[in-house]
Amino acid sequence: MALLCYNRGCGQRFDPETNSDDACTYHPGVPVFHDALKGWSCCKRRTTDFSDFLSIAGCTKGRHNSEKPPEPVKPEVKTTEKKELSELKPRFQEHIIQAPKPVEAIKRPSPDEPMTNLELKISASLKQALDKLKLSSGNEENKKEEDSDEIKVGTSCKNGGCSKTYQGPQSLEEVCVYHSGVPIFHEGMKYWSCCRRKTSDFNTFLAQEGCTTGKHTWTKKDAGKKVVPCRHDWHQTGGEVTISVYAKNSLPELSQVVANSTLLNVHIVFEGEKEFHQNVKLWGVIDVKRSYVTMTATKIEITMRKAEPMQWASLELPAAKNQEKQKEDTAE
């Protein structure tokens, strides 16, 4: 009568009369499962497939074994009728402490709230720079030069995206390749509104060739103030969000930063003739009264106090999320 061999990795039937010392090929070790790898403790082969694991040939020769291994012994739980049901409950339940209720998030205010001018703090370095350049005193002599029709050699073209300079009368006949739109910075991408070639790299953005042709604009009288992009970034702490705009020699009397709880509008005039504009729909809610602007000779820092101490996922509210908020406001 053929008997079943219970050696690990064998599982064959054998005749007890012909059983010999090398009749069985099996694994004397135990199964090992670690980090998705499967194998036997007695040999080095490992596999991630369970079917391959079952087909791993034994590593040891011996006699077939017909004795069924004993089943694992289950721990015996002794109870008595005298003990109450409460005494049989796990002890750890006695030490459970109810977690505090989560703090409810502040409801997002309406974007139509009145805008408020943030306090401007002017550093000593900016005051010294403006005094030196005589930009804050409204010098009449400079104004006359600005109003003059004379174009100096080396004057830069005022059209956006054009880097040409005036070299003489021949420059008046040159074709200007420029951007007719305005620079847009949104969710890490930079592009011009007129051609929308988006990039995340600031230097690549500055090097983008214009999409419109026309005549150079050499004087401010014709061009007005020149809207230009500025490198800017942001960081946050537990209670504040800070935006840094890298614009040199900004003019406090011509610049303003206005905000409400969820919107920020930045208008900065710097280096006499340049302007920077940025409108931001903030990801979180700010405390306008405790927010302020610090103007230095090299940059402007906008420090916004968070209405609640939480981590912002980004500076700007994503467009999709903003549309959902508008739908909710309309429904209400």
UniProtKB/Swiss-Prot annotation:
Listed InterPro entries: CHORD_dom, CHRD1, CS_dom, HSP20-like_chaperone
- Describe its function: Regulates centrosome duplication, probably by inhibiting the kinase activity of ROCK2. Proposed to act as co-chaperone for HSP90. May play a role in the regulation of NOD1 via a HSP90 chaperone complex. In vitro, has intrinsic chaperone activity. This function may be achieved by inhibiting association of ROCK2 with NPM1. Plays a role in ensuring the localization of the tyrosine kinase receptor EGFR to the plasma membrane, and thus ensures the subsequent regulation of EGFR activity and EGF-induced actin cytoskeleton remodeling. Involved in stress response. Prevents tumorigenesis.
Can you say what this protein is called?
Cysteine and histidine-rich domain-containing protein 1
Q: Which residues form the CHORD domain?
A: 5-64, 157-216
| Keywords for the protein's UniProt record, in alphabetical order | Acetylation, Chaperone, Metal-binding, Phosphoprotein, Repeat, Stress response, Zinc
Q: Which residues carry this modification: Phosphoserine?
A: S51
Location of the region described as Interaction with HSP90AA1 and HSP90AB1 in the Swiss-Prot/TrEMBL record: 65-316
Q: What organism does this protein naturally occur in?
A: Sus scrofa (Pig)
